[in-house]
Amino acid sequence: MISNLRRFLGVSCVVLQALLPLGAAGATEPFKIGIAPHTSARFILEQYQPLRMHLAKALGVEVEIVTAPDFTDYARQAIAQKFDLAVTTGHQARLLEADFRYMPLVTYKAPFKSLVITTQKGGGRSAKDLSGTTVIGLSPTSLVTLWGQHWLNRSGCKDVTIRYVSAADSVAQLLLAGEGTAGFVSLPNFQNLAPEVQTGLRVLAESPALTGRVYVLNARQRARRAAVEAALWSFAESAEGKRYLEKNKLEGYRKLKKGELAAMEPFADEVRRSLGLK
């Protein structure tokens, strides 16, 4: 009898929750900002604290910063609707917009490029030196890795082993430790490396300007769109926002240009294939 009562109460709770208005059912849920894992989780949580606090105050809700072990897992979480606001590079933003109804809001003014880096001493001097060696990148679905792999193919590099790691600072440290001949990182992450790390590295190749980190809002937060956009712009004008943008060399927010995300479709398609979506 006790078992039956528990079962009845459990079903009743589920039914009751389903009958509640949407706002009431999710009233206690925090607003989750999912940051693509371009660097270590510790650094991401620290880096985005000013934004978290500003949005919490502006929206009047609890705000959490979350990330993922790698770009592939991040994409899966975003597709599974784990984030209210996703901050990820243009190719994943395009996927989320085109296939999963996320709404693009803003990107950063600072140029975003993918870099192929090597060490000052002992690294490859040109693309042909990378054949038969190990090159270090982020996950197979990260923009810098996808562009870097295309660059290797265009350059005629053969028999290259790609080793995937979780963060840009790990790429740099592994190169300096002699565990790879070259690596793929973004320009912003390269600029954020410690000066003593940067001096041991050099840029072998760089991409044209690409669409970097884009803020895309989950469709379930459509009613909050105007408030979220206003909060982002006010953050950029606040003292803490200006410090954040200057410290991370981001220059500020800007609106996306017409067709800018659509131009990332070839890279978005590679993510689809990697995730088994086509």
State the predicted function of each range.
Residues 1-12:
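Bacterial N-terminal signal peptides that target proteins for export
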Residues 100-109, 204:
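A structural signal for short loop-to-beta-strand junctions that line the ligand-binding cleft
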Residues 29-38, 44, 110-118, 196-236, ...:
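Periplasmic-binding protein-like
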Residues 31-38, 44, 127-144:
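Short loop->beta-strand "edge-of-pocket" segments that line small-molecule binding or catalytic clefts
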Residues 27-91:
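Extracytoplasmic small-molecule ligand-binding "clamshell" domains
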Residues 72-86, 99-100, 128, 168-184:
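Short helices/loops that flank or line small-molecule/ion binding pockets
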Residues 62, 141-158, 162, 232-278:
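Ligand-binding clefts/hinges and TM-proximal coupling segments of bilobed small-molecule sensing domains
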Residues 122, 131-223:
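Pocket-lining segment of extracytoplasmic ligand-binding domains
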